[in-house]
Amino acid sequence: MIVMKFGGTSVANFEAITRAVFIVGGRLDQKPVVVVSALSKVTDLLYRISDAAACGNSEEVEDLMTELRSRHVNLVSELLAQSPMLKDDAVRRVNEICDKLAELVRAVCAVRELSDRNKAIIISNGELLSSTVICFVMNAKGIRTNWIDAREMMITSNSYLKGEPDEKEILARVPVKVAEAYEGMDAVITQGFIGSDIAGEQTVLGRGGSDYSASLIGMAIDAEKIEIWTDVDGVRSADPRKVENTKYLEKISFEEAAEMAHFGAKVLHPLTIEPAVKKNIPIYVLNSTNPSGKGTAILRSELIEDGVKSVSFKENIRVINIFSMKMINTSGFLRRVFEIFSDNKVSVDLISTSEANISVTVDSSQKIDKTVQELSEFAEVFVDDDKSQVSVIGKNIVKLNGMLKRTFAPLKKCNVYMISQGASFVNISFVVDREELAEVVKELHYHLFEQPEELPEF
């Protein structure tokens, strides 16, 4: 079996869904388990519906619900124009889903109160609708397909909007559900992003969670491979919005891909890699508009050559500097510092320490006031805003001769605030002023990828 995940842009409209179904049809001999996101922009629309309902804006709620319903009904009518009976059934099912959703959002609108539980139910409807539509289309094209409700097998914690997968339950349920659904079928289809807790309450995995769903399902069924279908030809050496001459990477390691995702690459959800690594399942990032393209293969490390693969970045970060003479020759100081970050649920990226100073980076979107207040009780704390983080990523780059020189030689005119080398030898990261980010990434990529033989001297 294989897992084929199609993102929102790969199922956005008539043409995209037609292509996706054609692609699935070419892999029936591999027994595909198809995982789909909501149609492009539909999750955003559902967030708007939930926000409008929470504010009691009934007129906006009705307008947005009409937009949601019309988009899917019109799409069904277009895709199934040659199959009137299936079209009628599909329209009926789409209307049932929309009617149930409308009932909930009107209730929310009436009380002007939106719980996390109800928000999770609302925003998950995009995947329920898209998977329903595509299932009907696949059957209309002669691909016998069963629809699986992900909520019956993707079990998570009871955190409604950021459910943590319960791998034990997922490993127990997914193979059974998939095997049952595959009886007499050519393919099965299910939803990314959504699940439920052990009590049956609906949850979601958080934004971008469809990739994660696909990887978890792949792990559970011991998939031969996991295909992530997007609208790009694979993983690039840098963000093309910052760098003109980026290169597509034919293959990278699990570790490199995980670092790229964590440090800002947009192709994969950061958590996607972990379940696949556990079973050594290769992941292929492919382009649904160019299905014959090679894409990028993400493989186990021993199949990948040493060297630089990517220049990645996080645009909006802040640096928290913690200074205290009590650090010197004092056991437990670091533990105390990081317990405060943990207790306040503030995630730390880079860490740099000296005898009396700790510097860490955190995403600018995180609330840190309470953390800073608690740290200030026993240390001096300085926060630097408007910073960006740049990471050079590649297998064993920390061990390569001259790699630090190659990384920092182009940056002599730039202020570098802290440097961190990953313990896995896969990344070298540093912090710069946000206003200098674009030029730093451009220069670094130029010297590492385009003209590596022409490096300036220190």
Q: Which residues make up each language-model segment?
A:
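Short hydrophobic alpha-helical runs that function as membrane-insertion/retention elements
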Residues: 225-229, 283-285, 349-350
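Nucleotide/pyrophosphate-binding catalytic subdomain
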Residues: 1-268, 273, 432-433, 452, ...
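A conserved regulatory-domain signal marking ACT and ACT-like small-molecule sensing domains
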Residues: 292-458
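Glycine-rich beta-alpha junction loops
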Residues: 39-40, 152, 232-234, 283, ...
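Surface-exposed amphipathic alpha-helical tracts and adjacent flexible/coil segments at the periphery
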Residues: 268, 279, 289-296
